[in-house]
Amino acid sequence: MSKRALITGITGYVGRGVARRLLEDGFEIIGLVRNSEDDFEKRVAELRAGLGESEKLTFVRGDMTDDSALKDLNVEGVTHIVHSAAVTRFNVEADLAQAANVDGSRNILEFAKGCPQLGCFSYISTIYACGLVDGEVLETRHQGPRTFANHYENSKFDAEALLQKEYGELPWQIMRVATIIADDDHGGVTQQNAFHNTLKLFFYGLLSLVPGKAEVPLYFVTGRFVVDAIAELTQHCERQSIVHICHSQDETPTLGELLNLAYDRFSEEEDFRSRNILRPLLCDAESFGLLVGEAEEMGATLMSQGLGSIAPFAKELFTVKDIKNDRFRAALKDYRAPDPKVLLNAVCSHLIKTRWGKRAG
């Protein structure tokens, strides 16, 4: 039987990587590209350049926020769906998070109901869908009500609840992914996020205070680890299962360790040492809020933009989560965790060498 996968979010980092892996494993791929893009053909050309010319690779227009966008899509032969499309910014607005991440998920779930040959629906979520909780976070359904650091977390919680409550007949599985900080264990970075923005502010001496507690674990993974896991588990689907694509707490660095390691690595650079930059101090949420407010009053500077990407996640840096991954370990054929200090050092080295993407690596 042929394998045919529909991938939403194929223009994104994870979706594109999963498409590449499934193509290698013999899948036919249908990539859903937003029909609101004026440069649809250009985006398709870029995807083909990255994924390779293949008869097994096709693209269709479709906007997940439009409930009629998928009505004309041929469901014949669709055996797998990987729903990775989402707005993942921590500072996403509430209405956009609802439209893209919750309502958009409902639309693709409704489409999935009409796929008679569907064997697996992989929903890509986040380990932070649990919200602002301390202690153990299990690979089970999150019970509400909860509080969240931002609308992104809240929308992922709501989308998970929607999937479990209204679509029990589908062969779904939820994959909660940790923060991707590098492409692979070598530390190369092709897509930056709030983590990299924080280190950038640190390196240039624009971060005197960091919100949080030193003992808070920071769950980091590489893109290759995530893509390989999603591709493998999508092909060996355990219906109505939830897994955490992350490493365990004892394999995870803390906020304090990250700051110390980054400072030591940055201090090897002459231009960093010459500026006599001090190690950032950990502070409470109120003090950090004052810093963000002062930066905003200065206008659109590197500092205000960087802090703006950190602030919506700041509350999480005060919660000590013990993310469990026992089910994930058991399901994966070959689980391996890199040395977190070696990985972080490699990432810092890459960011320094490329000056956060401004120079060739």
Question: Can you say where each PLM-predicted feature lies in the sequence?
Answer:
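Mid/C-terminal beta-alpha module of Rossmann-like enzyme folds, strongest
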Residues: 233-309, 358
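Glycine/proline-rich active-site loop of Rossmann-fold NAD(P)-dependent oxidoreductases
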Residues: 182-195, 233-243
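Conserved Rossmann-fold NAD(P)-dependent oxidoreductase catalytic core, especially the SDR/UDP-sugar
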Residues: 103-154, 173
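Amphipathic terminal alpha-helices
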Residues: 314, 318-361
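N-terminal Rossmann NAD(P)H-binding glycine-rich loop of SDR-like oxidoreductase domains
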Residues: 5-27
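Conserved beta-loop-beta element that borders a ligand/cofactor-binding pocket
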Residues: 160-187
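A conserved pocket-lining segment of Rossmann-fold NAD(P)-dependent short-chain dehydrogenase/reductase
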Residues: 93, 197-225, 229-233, 244-246
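NAD(P)H-binding glycine-rich loop region in Rossmannoid oxidoreductase-like domains
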Residues: 61-103, 113-114
